[in-house]
Amino acid sequence: MKKDNIDFGKEFDWGKASIDYAKYRDIYPDEFYNKIIGLGYCKENQKVLDLATGTGVLPRNMYKFGAKWIGVDIAENQIKYAKLLSKDFDINYIVSPVENLEFEENSFDVVTACQCFMYFDKNILIPKIHKWLKPNGHFLIMFMDWLPYESEIAYKSEELVLKYNPLWSGKGSTRYEIKTPDWLGNMFTVSNKTAFDIDVNFTRDTWHGRIKACRGIGTGALSEKEISKWE
């Protein structure tokens, strides 16, 4: 994958990070999932499409709430691990760019995009999501990030990533106001904007794994030799 506005156009492939992604990026605490359920989404008798599902973190962890899930990802290796980790669940996974997906009208109650919306071609995808959603359906855009200016460990970790990959643009996140997106048009209205803090605990090993599985390190951004130096 290559995006001009991400990492200055440097190519990356999440499938190359799948081993570490599967092991170290299933980090959302129960509070995160309970917040989604509390808002009335992804629950029993709903059909949900998870875009850029990765290793199926969202469908796997929310399966217990009773929704019927489909997860899609562009990276075949991500879907390979999603299927392995979902072997006890009735979750359907598809390998495809999200922009190439085709579903019938009114197919889903909810469409989710977690940690991924910036990668999509919105001109293609947004009309499709509008078509796929049932009347009164919902499109959830979710994002969780560390705050380097509030955590010395996060700040130093970003410095180390940038030492070996100065083109990485995933740095420097701060708290910000959730603005109404300009792509809404007459297709969507905003029903909820929510921001909250969550404490996520890491060991030395799990934090190392989480950073290695970020776009700046493990997605083909660095060679094996460069990764060894970073480690």
Predicted feature residues:
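Class I SAM-dependent methyltransferase SAM/SAH-binding core
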Residues: L49, T55-N100
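A short beta-strand submotif of the Rossmann-like class I SAM-dependent methyltransferase core
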Residues: A113-C114, K122
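A short acidic, Gly/Pro-enriched loop at the edge of an enzyme's catalytic core
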Residues: L101-V110
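Conserved catalytic/acceptor-binding region of the Class I
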Residues: H130, K134-V200
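A short, conserved alpha-helix within the catalytic core of class I
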Residues: F120-I129
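C-terminal helical/coil "lid" or tail adjacent to the Rossmann-like core of SAM-dependent
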Residues: S191-E231
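Conserved class I S-adenosyl-L-methionine
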Residues: M1-K43
